């Protein structure tokens, strides 16, 4: 936390208000972590006396105390809603959506919240006037990606879409140029731009 505080002071001094992204390489609401609902020793940095504050909440409180914007990306679903009170007008809540059904999600994303739970968290964030975004990376089943956009565009501000990599056999089965044309047409029909508007 001291390092984060130091970095925030440096960013403030440089007038660098680019949002902090939490996270593409991990998950701030990883459902398998034991400390997501446990007392955090980091509370002293944010002046919290609430022993239920998680590591993630403490970091968000610190960011908020410096009025520094943040972007959340999670597969944790409604677990993240407990921190929605910390969001300001320059912050955004995002989830990764890869599949539209539980069976595929359980196979490819073990330990993650199921798609309906993640979608519920987006709806709740939108209801609270929090900007929302979805990362659709990697696209494994283009039909499901298209269906997810159709299911969520009313309460999602921005979609980031990325192609599948490192699975040559699966990649070869997908007509990527065709998918790109179709997904761009769908986003345009829904009044959305791919990968813009979140920072």
Region spans (language model):
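C-terminal accessory regions of radical SAM enzymes
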Residues: 187-199
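Conserved AdoMet/S-adenosylmethionine-binding subsite of the radical SAM
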Residues: 2-190
């Amino acid at each position: 936390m001291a390092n984060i505080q130091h970095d925030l002071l440096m960013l403030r001094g440089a007038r660098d208000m680019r949002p902090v992204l939490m996270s593409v390489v991990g998950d701030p609401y990883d459902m398998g972590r034991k400390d997501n609902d446990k007392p955090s020793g980091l509370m002293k940095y944010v002046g919290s006396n609430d022993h239920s504050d998680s590591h993630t909440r403490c970091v968000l409180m610190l960011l908020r105390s410096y009025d520094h914007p943040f972007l959340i990306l999670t597969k944790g679903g409604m677990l993240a809603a407990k921190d929605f009170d910390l969001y300001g007008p320059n912050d955004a809540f995002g989830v990764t959506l890869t599949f539209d059904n539980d069976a595929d999600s359980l196979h490819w994303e073990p330990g993650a919240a199921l798609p309906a739970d993640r979608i519920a968290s987006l709806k709740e964030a939108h209801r609270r006037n929090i900007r929302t975004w979805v990362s659709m990376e990697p696209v494994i089943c283009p039909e499901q990606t298209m269906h997810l956009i159709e299911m969520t565009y009313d309460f999602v501000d921005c979609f980031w879409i990325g192609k599948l990599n490192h699975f040559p056999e699966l990649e070869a089965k997908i007509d990527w140029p065709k998918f790109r044309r179709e997904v761009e047409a769908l986003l345009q029909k829904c009044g959305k731009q791919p990968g813009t508007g979140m920072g």
